[in-house]
């Protein structure tokens, strides 16, 4: 009998080993969730979880004791337990990472909580979820388990179809989705292998590895230029076609100006007026007029397309514009906020056509002092459409059409600019990367577009008009409350980011003031931007400096604009391509012309928030389209060698920006195989463990183009020693 007992004990030990602690913890937690309203006795738990051996029962009691210590369950009576519902369930947002390190961000802030893939309940990035929170156990990170998906953030995905006989998959590069989407044959909408498609996830059964979806739209063949541009728009949830019903409504708007409209407006048709725009522009939002009033006194008019005269509040065109909130400028096309008939014809301030405008009129001295300003509805007629290049040539050669007017405006703009910088405005003088594209949309060359005097001339008068409009509404006596109005606001830089910037530039031998008055700091930033001009680190330091700044946004709560050093600022000058400018036009008319009462703060703040978020999405889509063209451009240049500079350092590798064309690619850390490299976040570098070699942000480096992945919009480089 003793022999038999020993065998039995051995068997029990084996059974005890068979179930790991981790598995039992999971089984217990799942069981408590299923029976969350019941009190469970120890005996009942043993029975239901088939814990028949002594070691397993002991392990179970240890875990129950830990869960009780962690306040996850309560021992309501001796050996009787109940799930604790207080404080262990939280609502928030699920964040999915491509490396499986998913997390949960609690509503109302708080530290992220790790959610293992097995506990994610197929949640997708951005989903609003409820989790059960396992408090910290000895030596273990706090963990959460998704117990309910409250709201899907995104259920449509863009990818490439792979079609088999009776089913298909959508293969997506979206890193927030762990698996491809399964599509039944009857839900394919005629899609074929190699088609780019938009697919909606309709269900994701508990036990299924893949979500199940249906095709919403076929965009075209992968690799085709229009298909790829539409795919980028769809990825960001932006529309790629214009609704026919809205186009139809625009077609009914008459282009003729009725006689009674002339009578209501100031007439500027006989005053020298012109537009200055990019050479490929069709939507001319703004025009400038100039005339001499008397010695040392000039009248300058900033005339803006009177879009809201044609687009009435609440109309079908207005609702579409509100939803879009901005035009989107991809690398080879514009996705307009308004129907084409309005933005390129009726509202566009085209030469030799009479147009309705909303204008800011200034009386200015030769020294740039503003003696008077008014905001009025006008009728104008542009005499000439200049490209920036043409206007620039007149400024440089002092010869050409309307040279006196252009040179006068240029001189006044330079004074306004000088005053702005003296007041503490920050001078980020960035160039843009542009592609020359053939008729098929293929990039054939890269060029840089920098801001010259002609651009700065237009910019200064737009800033002046925007500021003046904001002051007219916002600047009121202390005893009065200003009427509700959308402002363009920009907060002070984050002090921690400024400190990081200061430490970063020190290695290049530059200094930065991070404390003192607002103006002290901004002047110090300008000083830095001047110092780096023409240096090889210019682009890099400028990029890092911009990252230290806050993002400008729209709000009815005015805090001023730090970057421009204005106490009051708004957007008034681009109503063809920005919805906030349309709001500003409507409110100006209501307040200034009609003496109307203030509008709802809540409603307009919501419109401001929506516009700010759409502006960000549009900027991200624009960047993605540039990235796509960069990768496409470099596909033809595989194996070629380029000089560049390290533009980013992460734990997975080095980002390198090429000097010649500003294309950015990555050297994966796995390819740096001469040592084991560790990421030093504080010093923006990778450091070799044995040889101590470092690769730092800003280092000059030579690379070879190794791989180009258009699907991922990703370039891989190889280091050349």
Please describe what each predicted stretch is.
Residues 4-301, 308-353, 632, 685-686, ...:
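Charge-lined substrate channels and their catalytic hotspots, especially those that engage the 3′ end
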Residues 9-16, 619, 626, 678:
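Short amphipathic alpha-helical "recognition" segments used for binding
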Residues 47, 198, 204-205, 231, ...:
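Electropositive polyanion-binding surfaces
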Residues 111-116, 177-183, 662-679:
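A short macromolecule-binding patch
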Residues 507, 678, 683:
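Basic, polyanion-binding surface patches
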Residues 692-696:
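Divalent-cation-assisted or electrostatically stabilized phosphate/pyrophosphate-binding catalytic cores
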């Amino acid at each position: 009998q003793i022999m038999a007992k020993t065998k039995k004990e051995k068997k029990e030990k084996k059974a005890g080993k068979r179930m790991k602690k981790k598995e039992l913890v999971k089984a217990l937690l799942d069981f408590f969730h299923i029976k969350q309203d019941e009190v469970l006795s120890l005996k009942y738990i043993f029975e239901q979880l088939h814990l028949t051996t002594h070691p397993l029962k002991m392990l179970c009691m240890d875990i129950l004791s830990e869960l009780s210590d962690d306040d996850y369950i309560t021992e309501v009576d001796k050996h009787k337990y109940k799930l604790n519902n207080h404080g262990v369930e939280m609502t928030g947002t699920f964040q999915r990472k491509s490396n499986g390190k998913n997390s949960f961000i609690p509503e109302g802030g708080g530290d992220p909580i790790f959610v293992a893939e097995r506990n994610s309940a197929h949640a997708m990035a951005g989903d609003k979820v409820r989790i059960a929170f396992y408090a910290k156990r000895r030596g273990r990170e706090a963990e959460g388990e998704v117990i309910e998906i409250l709201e899907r953030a995104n259920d449509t995905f863009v990818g490439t179809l792979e079609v088999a006989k009776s089913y298909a998959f959508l293969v997506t590069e979206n890193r927030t989705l762990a698996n491809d989407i399964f599509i039944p044959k009857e839900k394919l909408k005629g899609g074929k292998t190699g088609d780019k498609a938009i697919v909606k996830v309709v269900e994701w059964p508990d036990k299924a590895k893949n979500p199940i979806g249906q095709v919403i739209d076929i965009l075209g063949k992968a690799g085709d230029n229009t298909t790829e541009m539409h795919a980028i728009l769809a990825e960001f949830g932006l529309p790629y076609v214009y609704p026919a019903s809205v186009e139809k409504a625009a077609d009914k708007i008459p282009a003729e100006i009725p006689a009674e409209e002339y009578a209501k407006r100031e007439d500027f048709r006989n005053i020298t007026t012109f537009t200055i725009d990019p050479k490929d522009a069709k939507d001319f939002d703004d025009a400038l007029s100039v005339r001499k009033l008397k010695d040392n006194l000039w009248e300058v008019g900033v005339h803006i397309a009177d879009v809201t005269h044609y687009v009435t509040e609440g109309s079908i065109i207005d609702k579409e514009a509100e939803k879009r909130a901005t035009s989107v400028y991809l690398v080879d096309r514009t996705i307009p906020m308004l129907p084409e008939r309005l933005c390129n014809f009726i509202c566009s301030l085209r030469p030799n056509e009479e147009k309705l405008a909303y204008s800011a009129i200034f009386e200015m001295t030769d020294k740039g002092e503003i003696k008077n300003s008014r905001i009025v509805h006008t009728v104008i007629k542009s005499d000439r459409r200049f490209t920036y290049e043409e206007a620039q040539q007149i400024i440089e050669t002092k010869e050409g059409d309307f040279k006196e007017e252009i040179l006068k405006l240029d001189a006044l703009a330079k004074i306004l600019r000088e005053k702005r910088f003296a007041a503490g405005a920050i001078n980020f003088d960035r160039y843009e990367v542009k592609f020359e594209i053939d008729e098929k949309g293929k990039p054939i060359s890269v060029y840089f577009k920098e801001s010259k005097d002609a651009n700065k001339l237009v910019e200064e008068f737009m800033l002046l008009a925007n500021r003046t409009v904001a002051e007219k509404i916002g600047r009121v006596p202390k005893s009065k409350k200003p009427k509700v109005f959308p402002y363009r606001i920009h907060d002070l830089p984050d002090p921690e980011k400024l400190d990081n910037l200061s430490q970063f530039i020190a290695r290049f031998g530059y200094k930065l003031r991070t404390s003192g008055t607002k103006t002290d700091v901004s002047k110090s930033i300008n000083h830095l931007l001047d110092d780096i001009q023409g240096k090889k680190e210019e682009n890099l330091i400028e990029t890092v400096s911009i990252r230290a700044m806050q993002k400008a946004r729209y709000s009815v709560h005015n805090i001023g604009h730090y970057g421009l050093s204005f106490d009051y600022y708004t957007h008034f000058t681009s109503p063809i391509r920005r919805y906030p400018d349309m709001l500003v036009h409507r409110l100006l008319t209501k307040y200034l012309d009609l003496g109307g009462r203030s509008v709802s703060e809540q409603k307009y703040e919501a419109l401001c928030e929506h516009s700010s978020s759409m502006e960000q999405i549009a900027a991200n889509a624009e960047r993605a389209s540039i990235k796509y063209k960069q990768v496409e451009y470099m596909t033809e240049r595989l194996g070629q060698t380029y000089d560049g500079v390290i533009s980013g350092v992460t734990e997975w590798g080095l980002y390198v920006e090429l000097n010649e064309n500003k294309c950015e690619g990555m050297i994966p850390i796995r390819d740096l195989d001469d040592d084991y490299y560790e990421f030093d976040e504080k010093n923006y570098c990778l450091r070799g463990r044995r040889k101590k070699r470092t690769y730092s942000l800003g280092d000059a480096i030579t690379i070879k183009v190794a791989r180009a992945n258009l699907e991922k919009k990703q370039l891989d480089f190889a280091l050349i020693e």
